[in-house]
């Protein structure tokens, strides 16, 4: 049981022995033999479908990784902290490679749903969640942003500051994604990989940490 839980990333809230005891103490099912067999066959059929789907996903992932390096902008996105090959490819695919398509970094942030919508009428101003956007782009850039805070002190600080202002986790991740978009935009326009030493805010945090140590 312990090995099974570890393999599937169980949070560890309850010990394996307690979970096993609960499973064994569960009341018996009330279904008849015929229904039990039918349900078993249905579950096994779904397992077969899932196995085939997972195999296809792995094949596609291998293909993405194999061809990502052929794109001239690949190094920009793979140089980002904890972007990974697959996530970097997702962000690159949604971001695109047409420089004239975007006026500035804010245009990219709007497309990716990383910036809110502000509505003004007279003295009234309302800020709301941006529903109209490229949702695949938002998922890709927010996945990267969430991962990046575990490798970049600057990203971790932007996220922590957003939480301190009262934002919940999804909102804080979008705030971080918007900040990253401005950084990536500069790299993308200059056609140069990300370098923390050239990223002013990130470099300053690194220097402060080094001085404190």
What are these regions (language model features)?
Residues 1-213:
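A detector of single, family-specific signature residues
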